[in-house]
Amino acid sequence: MATPLPPPSPRHLRLLRLLLSGLVLGAALRGAAAGHPDVAACPGSLDCALKRRARCPPGAHACGPCLQPFQEDQQGLCVPRMRRPPGGGRPQPRLEDEIDFLAQELARKESGHSTPPLPKDRQRLPEPATLGFSARGQGLELGLPSTPGTPTPTPHTSLGSPVSSDPVHMSPLEPRGGQGDGLALVLILAFCVAGAAALSVASLCWCRLQREIRLTQKADYATAKAPGSPAAPRISPGDQRLAQSAEMYHYQHQRQQMLCLERHKEPPKELDTASSDEENEDGDFTVYECPGLAPTGEMEVRNPLFDHAALSAPLPAPSSPPALP
């Protein structure tokens, strides 16, 4: 089963509309250009002036007749009229006349005046004459077609010096300022390297500064978070009494052990009335004293054998044991 094609997107529709409108506009312009073939085929006034002819008359496809200083030759080209020198030599065209003619044509084109056209039967399609300039801008040279039987005339400048008709050979210009270009390139490279080094040093300093700032922030946070100096623990009176009772118990226990050891070594003797209350006649039993009820407040269990010197609050010194009999 064939999958259905998705509908075209609005973007594709817009592109299609633009393409169709462009095709329609191109066809309309082409039709308008085809409706006026005479206007498109008629050369411009500057082209006619370069051909040394008058402007294109209305409805014609070619330029008008030759202008006043020129005459039409056998090939249908407008060539300057030859003037014979007083000595009777070859006729030579004058370059000043051609320059004056071109200046007059340009001025006439700007002013809008045109020469009256001649009938169409005398109009021919001439070959364009080449208008060139010398290599160094010394003068204006007009490339004139040469007839088979007429020698090529040599134009003269206003100063009377002949202008050679040979092709001008231009030597390639030698590059100047090569050392200056190399020096500029070296300076540009040096500035680029210096800028890159300065940028790298600045980035390194910035990274180190940011690292130091982060370390300082971490140290400040740890200092603020750390607890202060440990304060002395507060001991309730009940705990103090419990500690004293434990010490008394430890003392009595040590005393009973010492008495038992002495009785095994020596014969039994009668004890004082004070000691008879604490131990029986055989001495096989240990008397334990109850320290009393614990307080209703905080209660803490301590090891009697633990060194209480580690406590910050000094405990009362135990009473000295009575002398052994």
Curated annotation (Swiss-Prot):
State any GO CC term: plasma membrane
The Acidic residues compositionally biased stretches are 275-284
The alphabetized UniProt keywords are: Membrane, Phosphoprotein, Signal, Transmembrane, Transmembrane helix
Q: Which InterPro entries match?
A: NPDC1 (IPR009635)
- UniProt-annotated stretches for the region Disordered: 138-175, 266-290
Point out the signal peptide segment.
Answer: 1-34
The subcellular location is: Membrane
Membrane-topology descriptor = Single-pass membrane protein
Tissue-specific expression:
Strongly expressed in adult brain; especially in hippocampus, frontal lobe and temporal lobe.
The regions listed as transmembrane in this protein's record are 182-202
Q: Which residues carry this modification: Phosphoserine?
A: S229
Question: What Pfam families does the annotation carry?
Answer: NPDC1 (PF06809)
**Role of this protein:** Suppresses oncogenic transformation in neural and non-neural cells and down-regulates neural cell proliferation. Might be involved in transcriptional regulation.
Family, per entry: Belongs to the NPDC1/cab-1 family.
Recorded hits in PANTHER family, A to Z, give:
NEURAL PROLIFERATION DIFFERENTIATION AND CONTROL PROTEIN 1 (PTHR23352:SF2), NEURAL PROLIFERATION DIFFERENTIATION AND CONTROL PROTEIN-1 NPDC-1 PROTEIN (PTHR23352)
Q: What is this protein called?
A: Neural proliferation differentiation and control protein 1
- Organism equals Homo sapiens
Report the gene name: NPDC1
